[in-house]
Amino acid sequence: MEGLQRSTISFRRQGSSGIVFDDRLIAELNKSGNNEQKDESQRDEQPKPMSESSEQVKPIDEKDKLRPIKTGGGAPGGIERSRSNGGGAQRHHRTTGRVSPAVDPPSPRISSCGCCSAFGKNPPGKKVNPRKRPPKRRSRRRIVTKKR
């Protein structure tokens, strides 16, 4: 508990996960944990009645109580994997890595009433300069050739 930061405002300790621990609560939990350990040690010390067989019971070591966690992926009854979470057929090609998520496309411009379009902002791509005059239109002359 020494590793937790102590608040200057209240007499509580706060861990990195944001959970607030009260010192009284921690003291009660420690007491109840000590009581349970004492009960277990008393149970271990009590002599056990002999069973009908004449075999003596070996004391259980702590090493025998602990069992390793099985992490084998191919064991039956384990976690089944699909292609999306790393399982499936073996791939014999070179992978390029993960693909970055797609960027959301911009929302479409929907025209509404005239007031909204009159007072709305212009799209950022089109800048209108009121001082600039439109270019002059040139008429096309048609060259007419006489047919013979």
Curated annotation (Swiss-Prot):
Listed Polar residues bias regions: 1-17
Sequence ranges of Basic residues compositional bias: 128-148
GO cellular component terms attached to this protein's record: nucleus; plasma membrane
Keywords: Phosphoprotein
Modified residues (Phosphoserine): 100, 107
Pfam families named in the record: DUF4666
Entry annotated with the keyword Ubl conjugation: no
SS bond partners: none
Parts forming coiled coils: none
Biased amino acid composition, Basic and acidic residues: 36-47, 58-67
Region (Disordered): 1-148
Family matches, as PANTHER family: OS05G0542732 PROTEIN, OS05G0542732 PROTEIN-RELATED
Protein name: Uncharacterized protein At1g15400
Taxonomic lineage of the native organism: Eukaryota, Viridiplantae, Streptophyta, Embryophyta, Tracheophyta
